[in-house]
Regions:
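Charged/polar, solvent-exposed surface patches and flexible loops
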Residues: 38, 146, 182, 239-243, ...
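Disordered, low-complexity tails and leader-like regions
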Residues: 25, 148, 163, 190, ...
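Generic hydrophobic alpha-helical scaffold/packing signal
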Residues: 204-207, 241-245
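Short beta-strand-loop
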Residues: 223-244
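Generic alpha-helical secondary structure signal
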Residues: 178, 194-197, 232-239, 253-257
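An amphipathic, basic-hydrophobic helix/alpha-beta surface used to engage anionic
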Residues: 1-229
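Von Willebrand factor type A / integrin I
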Residues: 1, 18, 242-317
Length: 317
């Protein structure tokens, strides 16, 4: 007997989801009673689902058995043929085969098929310049102020200082090229598969909205080490999303420390997280936080699975 398991490597959530088991009987006798046990495992939380198939195979023939692949949530699923029992004609005795084969498949966000649009106009209108106290060669003088400890003495305006008998500092304005960082972190050990699914849907909607505006995005998620991708096209995003879904959940990190390291290098930072985050009074950082109850605080948007689609439609980045 020859047995093959075939599943697509990539499926879209709630889309077509058929896989197949091919069984070929090479013997001169029919197999009237064959039992197959299949097990699915969600790689994020190791939740399992089992199913039993009963069928028959005529002599020198092949059976193509359709199996329905679970696609309710985004993520990576493993499907395994755990056991095969081939019974005799009277279903009294059987030959058993165990752990025959295993395949994995990725379930992509439904946003790949829908036209979700997020208003990202705010990203181009805010923070077009970077005020830098240590700037030496600024593009132009933005303002003047009294000298404070730490100001660059090369920016002293000597003519005004001599007139006013006080040190006057030129505040320089330095153009900064737009740089967008999208940060994804699944931190809580108790995070549900529903939260993870909603976060991936949001990630897909945010990045695809940026790509439609022909913006380049740096995408970062944390495991034991930082994983960073530069995304220019939907194909590149699909590749990094596939990598993300095949990884273990992130280690718990200090979000505040991470933001202090990164915020000065990017004009805009979008953080998609599943844990409570500190308040960051900075215009260029936006947190999209997932939880069990809805609410909002300052620059944080708190999503739940129930309000996700409404919140995405109202989100202004």
């Amino acid at each position: 007997m020859t047995i093959q398991l075939r599943v697509p490597q990539k499926l879209v959530k709630n889309g077509p989801n058929e896989g197949y088991i091919y069984v070929k009987n090479n013997a001169p006798i029919s197999l009237g009673h064959v039992v197959c046990w299949i097990e699915w495992t969600n790689k994020l939380n190791n939740q399992k689902k089992k199913e039993k198939l009963i069928f028959s195979v005529s002599r020198y023939s092949e059976e193509k058995l359709p199996i329905e692949l679970p696609t309710r949530y985004c993520g990576t699923m493993q499907v395994e043929i755990k056991q095969f029992r081939i019974y005799d004609a009277f279903a009294l005795f059987y030959t058993e085969l165990k752990k025959l084969m295993c395949e994995t498949y990725n379930i992509l966000p439904a946003g790949f098929l829908s036209n979700v649009h997020i208003n990202a106009q705010g990203l181009t209108s805010s923070l077009n310049v970077l005020n830098d106290k240590s700037a030496i060669d600024g593009v132009e003088i933005a303002d003047f102020k009294l000298y404070e400890y730490g100001d660059n003495i090369k920016n002293i305006h000597w003519k005004l200082s001599s007139k006013m008998d006080e040190l006057i500092i030129k505040q320089m304005e330095q153009n900064m090229q737009e740089k967008i960082l999208v940060f994804f972190s699944l931190q809580e050990a108790q995070s549900s598969i529903e939260q993870y699914d909603s976060m991936l849907e949001t990630l897909s909607a945010v990045i695809q909205s940026f790509l439609k505006q022909e913006k380049t995005i740096e995408f970062v998620w944390l495991e034991k080490d930082e994983q960073c991708y530069s995304i220019h096209t939907e194909t590149e995003f699909l590749a990094c999303l596939t990598d993300l879904m095949n990884k273990e959940s992130s280690t718990i990190i200090n979000t505040q420390t991470f933001m202090q390291q990164y915020y000065s290098f990017y004009t805009h930072i979008i953080c998609i997280v599943d844990a409570e985050v500190p308040v960051f009074p900075m215009e260029n950082i936006r947190f999209i936080q997932y939880g069990e109850t809805s609410g909002a605080s300052l620059n944080n948007v708190l999503f739940t699975r129930d309000n996700m689609h409404r919140q995405l439609g109202e989100l202004y980045l």
